[in-house]
UniProtKB/Swiss-Prot annotation:
ANK repeats lie at residues 25-60, 64-93, 97-126, 130-159, 163-192, 200-232, 235-265, 269-298, 302-332. One of its GO terms (cellular component) is nucleus. This is Ankyrin repeat domain-containing protein 42. It comes from Homo sapiens (Human). SUPFAM superfamilies: Ankyrin repeat. Residues 7-19 have a biased composition (Polar residues). The lineage of its organism: Eukaryota, Metazoa, Chordata, Craniata, Vertebrata.
C-alpha cells in the first residue's frame, strides 16, 4: 500500500519452476500497479482494482509529484484511467512542473486516453507553470491526433505561453509540418500566421530559420505567404473559393447559379471550391457541389484531390462522402449500358455544342423541335424561286 518503503513486487511473488503453480504478484503501491500495464495483466494479477477496492490512496505522489493518474496518462493505460476516474481521481492534480494528466497524455500522443479524460469534464485549457496548455504540448511534440482532438473540444490555438508563443510557433520551432499545416488552416486568417510575433520578436519564419527547419521554410515560401494579404487577394479573385472555405452555401449557390463563377473554377494553386469545402469539412457545401456536377477528381498543384485534402485535415465524414463518389465514378466508367440514354448524358463530350437534353425529349417535344426545320426548308424554296425569276 502507499507509503511502503519497498514498492516493488515482493520476492514471494516470483514464479516457481513449475509454470502451472504461479503466485499472485503483490504491489507495494498503486503506482506499481499502474506501471504493470495492459488490461490483461491488470485482470490476471488483480492489481489496480484490488488496490482500489482495498482503499488505496489515489492522491499519493512520487518524488516528481506524479499521481497514479499521471503515470496512467504517460503510459496511455486507458483502462487504468477509467478505473481511476470512477474512483474519484483528481485529474487536475499538478506535478512539480504544473502538468496535469491531460498535459502528459498530449505530450506522449495518447489521444484515446486524452479523450477519456476530456469526457470526464476536465478543463482542456488548464496551464502549467510555463503557461503551456495541452495544445502547446501537442504542437511542440508533433502529436497531430491529440492536437486535432483538443481543437475539436474547443481549445483555443491563439493562447500564448509565458514567452508569447502560440502553438503554431512551437510546431514551426520543432519542424512538425503536419501540425503546422493544421494550425495554419485553423487560424482566423492566413496572414495572421506571419504577423504573430512572440515576446522575443520572432514569428514562425524566424523560428524555422533559427532552428534549421527546412520543411517549414519550404512550405511557407511555396505558399507565398510572405508580403501578401492572401485573404483579401483571394476574396477578390476567387469569391467562390472563399464562400466554400467559410461554408457559406447561400453565397456559393448565388455565385454559381448567376454564372459569376464556374463550379470547377481553379485558383492559383490549382484548387477548386470542392477542395476548399473538403479542407474545412463543410458537408452541405460538398453535397451541393456534387449535386451540381462538380468534378471530384481534379487535383491541385500538390497533386491532391478533394478527398486527399479532407484526409489531411481529418474530416472523416467528408472523406467518406468523396471516396464513395470517386468509387461510383470508376464503376460508372467501366460499365457501359447502351440502353441507358442517361449514360450518354453523363458522359457527353466536354465542350460539345450538342443539346444533350434532346435525348430525353417526349414525342410532342420532338415534334415541336422539328418545326423550325420545316420553316427553314420553306424559306430555302422561296429563295430558289426568286433566283430563277
Amino acid at each position: 500500500m502507499p507509503g511502503v518503503a519497498n514498492s516493488g513486487p515482493s520476492t514471494s511473488s516470483r514464479e516457481t519452476a513449475n509454470p502451472c503453480s504461479r503466485k499472485k504478484v503483490h504491489f507495494g503501491s498503486i503506482h506499481d500497479a499502474v506501471r504493470a500495464g495492459d488490461v490483461k495483466q491488470l485482470s490476471e494479477i488483480v492489481c489496480l482494482h484490488w488496490l482500489l477496492w482495498h482503499g488505496a490512496d489515489i492522491t499519493h505522489v512520487t518524488t516528481r509529484g506524479w499521481t497514479a493518474s499521471h503515470i496512467a496518462a504517460i503510459r496511455g493505460q486507458d483502462a487504468c484511467v477509467q478505473a481511476l476516474i470512477m474512483n474519484g481521481a483528481n485529474l487536475t492534480a499538478q506535478d512539480d512542473r504544473g502538468c496535469t494528466p491531460l498535459h502528459l497524455a498530449a505530450t506522449h500522443g495518447h489521444s484515446f486516453t486524452l479523450q477519456i479524460m476530456l469526457r470526464s469534464g476536465v478543463d482542456p485549457s488548464v496551464t502549467d507553470k510555463r503557461e503551456w496548455r495541452p495544445v502547446h504540448y501537442a504542437a511542440f511534440h508533433g502529436r497531430l491526433g491529440c492536437l486535432q482532438l483538443l481543437v475539436k473540444w474547443g481549445c483555443s490555438i491563439e493562447d500564448v505561453d509565458y514567452n508569447g508563443n502560440l502553438p503554431v510557433h512551437l510546431a514551426a520551432m520543432e519542424g512538425h509540418l503536419h501540425c503546422f499545416k493544421f494550425l495554419v488552416s485553423r487560424m482566423s486568417s492566413a496572414t495572421q500566421v506571419l504577423k504573430a510575433f512572440n515576446d522575443n520578436g520572432e514569428n514562425v519564419l524566424d523560428l524555422a530559420q533559427r532552428f534549421f527547419k527546412q520543411n517549414i521554410l519550404q512550405f511557407i515560401q511555396g505558399a507565398e505567404y510572405e508580403g501578401k494579404d492572401l485573404e483579401d487577394q483571394e476574396t477578390l479573385a476567387f469569391p467562390g473559393h472563399v464562400a466554400a472555405f467559410k461554408g457559406d452555401l447561400g453565397m456559393l449557390k448565388k455565385l454559381v447559379e448567376d454564372g459569376v463563377i464556374n463550379i470547377n473554377e481553379r485558383a492559383d494553386n490549382g484548387s477548386t471550391p470542392m477542395h476548399k469545402a473538403a479542407g474545412q469539412g463543410h458537408i452541405e457545401c460538398l453535397q451541393w457541389l456534387i449535386k451540381m456536377g462538380a468534378d471530384s477528381n481534379i487535383t491541385n498543384k500538390a497533386g491532391e484531390r478533394p478527398s486527399d485534402v479532407a484526409k489531411r485535415f481529418a474530416h472523416l465524414a467528408a472523406v467518406k462522402l468523396l471516396e464513395e463518389l470517386q468509387k461510383y465514378d470508376i464503376d460508372d466508367e467501366n460499365e457501359i449500358d447502351e440502353n441507358d440514354v442517361k449514360y450518354f448524358i453523363r458522359h457527353g463530350v466536354e465542350g460539345s455544342t450538342d443539346a444533350k437534353d434532346d435525348l430525353c425529349l417526349s414525342d410532342l417535344d420532338k415534334t415541336d423541335a422539328r418545326r423550325p426545320s420545316k420553316n427553314c426548308r420553306a424559306s430555302w424554296s422561296m429563295n430558289d424561286y426568286v433566283e430563277k425569276n
